[in-house]
From Swiss-Prot:
Residues at which Zn(2+) binds: 70, 106, 109
Active site: 72 (proton donor)
Lineage of origin: Eukaryota, Metazoa, Chordata, Craniata, Vertebrata
One Pfam family cited in the UniProt record for this chain: MafB19-deam
Catalytic activity: adenosine(34) in tRNA + H2O + H(+) = inosine(34) in tRNA + NH4(+)
Keyword vocabulary terms for this entry: Hydrolase, Metal-binding, tRNA processing, Zinc
UniProt GO BP: tRNA wobble adenosine to inosine editing
Enzyme Commission number: 3.5.4.33
Protein name as annotated: tRNA-specific adenosine deaminase 2
CDD domains the UniProt entry points to: nucleoside_deaminase
Domain of life: Eukaryota
Keyword Cell cycle: no
Amino acid sequence: MQEVGVDPEKNDFLQPSDSEVQTWMAKAFDMAVEALENGEVPVGCLMVYNNEIIGKGRNEVNETKNATRHAEMVALDQVLDWCRLREKDCKEVCEQTVLYVTVEPCIMCAAALRLLRIPFVVYGCKNERFGGCGSVLDVSSDHLPHTGTSFKCIAGYRAEEAVEMLKTFYKQENPNAPKPKVRKDSINPQDGAAVIQVMRGPPDEETETIAHLS
């Protein structure tokens, strides 16, 4: 595992032990498997406060048709509910909470973690396309005034397993993807070229353009 965004003077008492990482990440991977079995991108997340899970989630993007329902956002909503029900100060609770997730949080989720002042994140594999903890942007540790506080990451726990689950998902046919359509107006009668746009997933995912020449 690799430490990212280390601040030795900040919240070292929250540094999870190896046994804690093993225990909580095992449960996060169980959530990721559940996501995969339900046709979602296999990401699972737990939020642990005083050795208690106060929020957990898996991706629910396809189920809810809402591109923001990432595992971390689902778990954060549960944390807010947990605090309200117990009349706890959410800010104080979040400052004592560790987040465990199977894939590096995206830029959106990393920004939410900053705003809520989550001090520690443990994650599995990197998110090379959307990662907010160093892979694309370093939302976790960059100096960003008025955006909450930076947080420390421990990266790489069971990373290969997390990657394999992602590969399994993307090899499957996405039932929510629109059917490929031929753009008739793009046919050039002179060279017979037709352009086909194929949507591989929801609108927030990649659009691949395939050019076919006769």
